[in-house]
């Protein structure tokens, strides 16, 4: 069904400080089930490059080139990160300024691995946390390409389970996931209790 939903307008909200809107029109959604990464458990696409509007505050620590970052908040206008705050703000902005594509998003992915529930500062695991999604400044993958090119690809994770503040993901006007659990009948099989 995630393939069927491609072409939708996305809206993501959470109580602590995220309100994002973007389009994924004409960009494929890619199912990840162990062909490229182990562990796996995500479906990814990319936003139309200039479509991202709003703000997001990540609640999982992220490790990038040996530096741990906390409480990153990004603000977007016409797809571009116009403000980035958090721990080590100078280094954060320096990384995003690596090149022109560093301030645009190259990936959006919904994660659902039932065996990964807490961040561990290893992005191959953290990006699969059940009830999370990641939003990635930098380079887009060729198989879900929005045209953004960059030397960086920095997966940043927001966990939407109730113990992390909750949140909602909407495709068009349909609530798809609430507080980390899929609420659309066709996607309920991806909830942790159905995958274990």
Which residues does each PLM region occupy?
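Single conserved hydrophobic/aromatic residue that forms the stacking wall/gate
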Residues: 1-7, 11-12
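N-terminal small-residue-enriched
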Residues: 13, 18-196
């Amino acid at each position: 069904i995630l393939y069927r939903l491609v072409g939708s307008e996305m809206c993501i909200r959470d109580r602590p400080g995220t309100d994002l809107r973007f389009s994924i029109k004409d960009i494929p959604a890619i199912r990840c089930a162990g062909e490229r990464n182990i562990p796996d458990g995500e479906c990814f696409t990319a936003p139309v490059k200039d479509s991202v509007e709003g703000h997001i505050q990540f609640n999982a620590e992220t490790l990038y080139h040996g530096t741990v970052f906390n409480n990153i908040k990004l603000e977007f206008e016409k797809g571009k990160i116009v403000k980035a705050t958090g721990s080590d703000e100078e280094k954060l902005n320096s990384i995003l300024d690596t090149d022109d594509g560093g301030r645009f998003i190259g990936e959006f992915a919904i994660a659902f691995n039932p065996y990964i529930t807490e961040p561990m500062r290893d992005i191959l695991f953290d990006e699969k946390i059940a009830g999370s999604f990641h939003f990635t400044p930098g380079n887009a993958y060729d198989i879900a390409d929005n045209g953004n090119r960059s030397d960086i690809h920095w997966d940043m994770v927001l966990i939407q389970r109730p113990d992390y503040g909750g949140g909602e993901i909407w495709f068009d006007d349909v609530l798809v996931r609430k507080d980390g659990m899929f609420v659309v009948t066709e996607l309920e099989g991806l909830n942790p209790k159905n995958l274990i």
